[in-house]
Amino acid sequence: MSGKARLHYPVTRQSEQLDHYFGQAVADPYRWLEDDRSPETEAWVKAQNRVTQDYLAQIPFRDAIKGKLATSWNYAKEGAPFREGRYHYFFKNDGLQNQNVLCGQLAGKPAEVFLDPNLLSPDGTTALDQLSFSRDGKTLAYSLSLAGSDWREIHLMDVESKQPLETPLRDVKFSGISWLGNEGFFYSSYDKPDGSELSARTDQHKLYFHRLGTAQEEDRLVFGAIPAQRHRYVGATVTEDDRYLLISAADSTSGNRLYVKDLTREGAPLLTVQGDLAADVSLVDNKGSRLYLLTNRDAPNRRLVTVEADNPGPEQWRDLIPERQQVLTVHSGGGYLFAEYMVDATARVEQFDHDGKRVREVGLPGLGSVSGFNGKQDDPALYFGFENYAQPPTLYKFEPNSGAISLYRASAAPFKPEDYVSEQRFYRSKDGTRVPLIISYRKGLKLDGSNPTILYGYGGFDVSLTPSFSVSVANWLDLGGVYAVANLRGGGEYGQAWHLAGTRMNKQNVFDDFIAAAEYLKAEGYTRTDRLAIRGGSNGGLLVGAVMTQRPDLMRVACQAVGVLDMLRYHTFTAGAGWAYDYGTSADSEAMFDYLKGYSPLHSVRAGVSYPSTLVTTADHDDRVVPAHSFKFAATLQADDAGPHPQLIRIETNAGHGAGTPVAKLIEQSADIYAFTLFEMGYRQLPRQP
């Protein structure tokens, strides 16, 4: 039994707001919660948090879970080194530092701290986002996120003195930092929106060049000045030899235009590499005037093509690494190209030279995910990380000329891979589609149908859920839990066709895949209904919301984080319009409106239905998926749910969509989610003492 009988939800005012779509009236009684800075909304947030925290405080093992998380998180972590100027840099964390620290090291000397974001805010909510060095390595440009917002400030630092240079650049969002020599860099910015920066829509991205020693007001507008250059996302890349500028322009999360300009020729025109939005194309490398491009144009699983920069149109592209059955990603460094193939959501890596000759397959330690294989063209060694759900990240050194691999740094995580099982299974979805599912648990676990199980999914935006280690998940396994990750349609695990099969009017496939995964886990003896929780964040929060409203009988607990839950209005907030490629919008057509309304979690809550125990989590500074989605959904659940289970919302303050969240907040969030999950499954003591 849960404790809903003891819950008294805050009163949430209902308005008479009605919207009309193609002659249909749709009520939106909690529209006022979209004003995230109004005193009424702020009071509502405080009241909801009080109810949630009071409920969580009664759980007898909540503190034990938090203590175990803090203990197991407290180990030294160090990232792969990279070379800039005279220094080798790396990120490190002593254990429980809220943000990773940038360190630099000269040959033969001890490492020193270059940039410590933990000193920038007392609560650790100022996070380092991107960093980029001038070609000579003497100047560092880095962007900071404040309280989790997508808006950034770009700061400049003199490397030798570690002193700041200039006034920070403001109003930066969804931007890279791409240097041109040592004189300045390209970055992207939106005009300051009308209304709240945290909820107002941002549409036109512009590319600027900032020259060192000048004010931001003097920055040169490079792209975005004319109507033909109006795009929602604009970014720049300068080739390592400073010869070419490439500009990518897109209106959604799939498909982009690409342009190239020869920076060595004064007055050189901006040439079109790809002039439509029919496919994705991006620069991997260049060798002289030859560009190396990764694209899914005429290749759903992607291919690597080459083209001369002075005649770069698609009709001139030539395959260097042709499309295969597996999805391709390409990295460059050390004078070589590295083709990473995804085989049933796990990585294989092959090395090629710039003429397309296959040099070797890189021997990986096992089945899992890799990161790295990036560097400068003259780097004598590259580094890569390897991990899976049972294996903490381990760093390896790779010598591209010989192919030699050596252990660079083993993980200090207090977990032994041999204590866990991580197995891949395949199941059939509603329409017969074969879907992969990776299931992890501690060795010795009895598959008798009684295990507390979390099923996690995402299923969107061409994002692939590859095996990765998480201290939080490892703790769940140590508590006696099962953790299952479904590689749903809508993701990128099997290329463009897999992605498109979970978009727009195919979105129901994603929900059906997830429902089938839950049924598989129960049929195979991993768990049962009252021991099953479903979980997802962002687009995965939409997934959880849709599945719990379509099949409230399927699971006992639903935990959704920063979810997209109002499918009729998502495109009117901040970056939401950029997701239309995956979702479609309620303004597209009557058929699209009907389809969206049919699964929109906010509009699918039905009065008189008993819903599972639900914990909605969001953050007050989330300007990617604005918290109004979660606010309105939680208010609707609290008003309409007829069952005995709690419908709670946990609202993090001074936090955003997730990236850069301080370690202290991550520990608290994980502890609350696990405590709630186990308590609502009926546990009054931990299923396994860690």
UniProtKB/Swiss-Prot annotation:
One of its GO terms (biological process) is proteolysis. SUPFAM superfamilies: alpha/beta-Hydrolases, Peptidase/esterase 'gauge' domain. Its EC number is 3.4.21.26. The active site is at 538 (charge relay system), 657 (charge relay system). Keywords: Hydrolase, Protease, Serine protease. One of its GO terms (cellular component) is cytosol. It catalyses: Hydrolysis of Pro-|-Xaa >> Ala-|-Xaa in oligopeptides. The keyword Hydrolase applies. Signal peptide: none annotated. One of its GO terms (molecular function) is oligopeptidase activity. Pfam families: Peptidase_S9 (PF00326), Peptidase_S9_N (PF02897). It comes from the Bacteria. InterPro entries: AB_hydrolase_fold, Pept_S9_AS, Pept_S9A_N, Peptidase_S9_cat, Peptidase_S9A, Prolyl_oligopep/macrocyclase. Cleaves peptide bonds on the C-terminal side of prolyl residues within peptides that are up to approximately 30 amino acids long. Has an absolute requirement for an X-Pro bond in the trans configuration immediately preceding the Pro-Y scissible bond. Belongs to the peptidase S9A family. This is Prolyl endopeptidase. It comes from Aeromonas hydrophila.
